Amino acid sequence: MLKCQNMVLKISGRKFIRFLKPRITFQTNTTRLQPFQNATWRVQVPKREMVTLIVATTYDPASINPATVLLAMPGWTTGPTLPPNIKSFTNQQTRLIQHDVSIVKEDDLDSRWEEATGEVVDEVIFLSRHTAVSNRPALTVHPIGVLHLKEGESPPHGGKAGWAGLTNPRIGPWLRLLKKMAEAHSLVPEFEITLEGTHHGPLTSKPTMFLEIGSTEEYWKRQDAAHVIALLIWEGLGLGGGEPVGNWNSETGKRKVLLGIGGGHYAPRHMDIVLKDDIWVGHLLSGYSLPMEEAKPGESHIGGTWRQSIQSAFEATKASFPGGEILAHLDQKSFKGWQKKAITEFLAEQNINVGRPNDFT
């Protein structure tokens, strides 16, 4: 027995004593210890594991169905409960959490998971339904944020006014993989495979993307669509033993990242570029995310929150792709002359490079 100040330490034939969080190792060459003689103290802070967080909700069949298919695949075990009562499941470095409310209403799930488990969340992937006026069946991928709203305005579908989430680098590579999988499972041409512009919440602090099934209840419940989304995650994260798809590394491969500006919600002209191999995707600002008020006669100032949107989108995209080459791609035909002039001048002022389609090859 060793007395160290007011602390009694027991030794059972071991040559070291460990304390965790942080771990303190006391090493000696004998089991009968003389206080602090011939001993070394070493502080070791345990490594925190990096994990992918997948979020599903029982509130939505287009969310829980793919999650259920995914959980039926090998390797899953029950994980800890996230307060107040959110179930979790674990498979290698992947965590799937399942709650019971709207997918856009549970904020800060990444930081809440870190606080509860001590793990570090590397990215967040939400499973959700998609709605559209056209009611067309679709499988969609998109970043999140509510960049164009003014401070004090209340976003209708989660997030925070003026906020741009970090974009998940997997968006581009997974869109291309999703298209191949959907074709292989005969979902195309019935289902459109597409990007969506940046929109809605919830709040996160880690690189995030949404995978959605649309666009009506009939399609939200489609098991073949749920199966393809589950396979996308399974293969995309390498859970089956293959190489993960879409891990960002500025040291290898192409580094060009598309920042989409303008166009409709489904970003068709940006899509044409993103479907090329090795193109990465940052924020996608549809026309509604770029409110512009034409200057009054005799004035030059163009009002609206479009500058805020572009700047926030650029900064978030840049932070999501360290070492990347961010190129703004404008949907030229979606702007009036005065709008295009104002945007290109602002991009130049902000030192944001503009890329034409051929610049992404």
Regions found by a protein language model. Name each.
Residues 274-292:
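Acidic, Ser/Thr-rich peripheral helices and adjacent loops at domain boundaries
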Residues 7-9:
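N-terminal low-complexity segments that are often proline-rich with Ser/Thr-Pro
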Residues 11-20, 24, 29-205, 216-217, ...:
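N-terminal catalytic or cofactor-binding beta/alpha core of small enzyme domains
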